[in-house]
Amino acid sequence: GPPYDFGM
């Protein structure tokens, strides 16, 4: 989820 949506 925001701010990270890179799927890591």
Curated annotation (Swiss-Prot):
- Keywords for the protein's UniProt record, in alphabetical order: Amidation, Hydroxylation, Neuropeptide, Secreted
Give the protein's biological function: May act as a neurotransmitter or neuromodulator and play a role in the integration of information within the brain. May be involved in the control of visceral muscles due to its ability to behave as potent inhibitors of peristaltic movements. May also fulfill a neurohormonal role on muscles of the gut and heart.
Which organism is this protein's natural source? Calliphora vomitoria
Modified positions (Methionine amide) in chain numbering: M8
A single Gene Ontology CC term: extracellular region
Q: What is its main location?
A: secreted
Residues with Hydroxyproline modification:
P3
Protein's cellular compartments? Secreted
Q: Give the UniProt tissue specificity note.
A: Neurons within brain and abdominal ganglion.
Give the domain of life: Eukaryota
Which protein, by its recorded name, is this? Callatostatin-5
According to its UniProt entry, the protein's GO biological process terms are: neuropeptide signaling pathway
The entry assigns this protein to a family as follows: Belongs to the allatostatin family.
